[in-house]
């Protein structure tokens, strides 16, 4: 029997992220507590920039964005938030979307699989994803459950289960 496998990836659906940013923008424009504070949200590339006249207002925009991201199925671990900083008369926060599994996290995930996972599981890095293989599908399902409960700084998805 051939080996079964799955891929561990960390990707953000850009359409869902775009929808969440647009919903946040619409809510910021309509809410009374954001009137006359210069509140805005912009998205370019993998960076979302929020602006407002006070630090509290810009944090409130971030909170609205996080709520919309969760409702659209995007985990908060895939957002890297900067600290609020003053720029002229306004405060700004930059949020970056994290995609892909970097080498350090790939090694960390591989170590978790080796140390705590069932015997006979093999993992290897392929670009920005991790391929996990085994002869037993049950072992792969146990590995998925293990990784879902593991403390990893990424929003992990499991794809291509064969």
Swiss-Prot record:
Pfam families: DUF520 (PF04461). Transmembrane segments: none annotated. CDD domains: YajQ_like. Disulfide bonds: none annotated. It comes from the Bacteria. SUPFAM superfamilies: YajQ-like. GO terms for cellular component: cytosol. GO terms for molecular function: nucleotide binding. Keywords: Nucleotide-binding. InterPro entries: DUF520, UPF0234-like_C, UPF0234_N, YajQ-like_sf. PANTHER family: UPF0234 PROTEIN YAJQ. Nucleotide-binding protein. Belongs to the YajQ family. This is Nucleotide-binding protein CMM_2802.
